[in-house]
């Protein structure tokens, strides 16, 4: 198996994978906080999770070149995780449109129904980048599971950091708990990445690349974790929010770099542009 080195599937695809995971994670985490009291939830925060995924989808569409390629690729859902991702994102965004209309019309019952349905679609959107990025044919099953856990946790932690950043402007009342959730998920990501990296050997070139890739997330996440810890002990809400905002940007940068490294590390079979559109 040769490493995945195609430059055309670099920044745009990595951005889509990052935003898909972050937007769906943000929705799942935020909705879970207010699942029993939706009347206290911020519509802007709920809809932000859909907006982030929509931006990611624009990155993917710009990569595909022409709009009709979107539908051509979607037909290939049986054999392509990227094609499945297009379908999952579309269902999730349609649900988000329904929630936006329900908020505009004041249909509280419909908001609850579509909100719960959105959790299912968000879970599918969250799984899509994990499954695409971890798809390695020549790494043992338990190691594939380990890489999936790291990718999943990094997506969840990115979603949590975005909530902490947005809460500063949209819902300051949840700033502290969003920082605490971010700290917990970043710690879990660092632990999982360290354990997975230490399980890899140095003899095989693929394992050396994998080790380097999974270690790349350690520095930015550690800096972000330190800043969040500093924010927790700050007594001034404005300073706490400012530190959390900086920590969020650093964590997002680390997540994007991690995905760029995954796309170039050879951890999964190469994506061939023509394969995306085969019927």
Give each language-model segment a name.
Residues 1-36, 47-50, 265-268:
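N-terminal signal-anchor module of multipass membrane proteins
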Residues 1-15, 72-76, 80, 208-212, ...:
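Extramembrane terminal tails and long inter-domain/linker segments of multi-pass membrane proteins
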Residues 5-6, 45, 74, 237-241:
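Helix-boundary and loop/linker segments of multi-pass membrane transporters
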Residues 11, 17-22, 37, 76-82, ...:
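Long, contiguous internal "core" modules enriched in hydrophobic/ aromatic residues
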Residues 26-33, 38-91, 95:
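Membrane helical hairpin/interfacial module
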Residues 43-50, 240, 245-248:
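Short, 15-30-residue, compositionally biased linear elements
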Residues 58-61, 83-85, 131, 257-265:
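Juxtamembrane membrane-interface segments at transmembrane alpha-helix termini
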Residues 65-72, 133, 137-139, 202, ...:
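Juxtamembrane/interfacial segments flanking transmembrane helices
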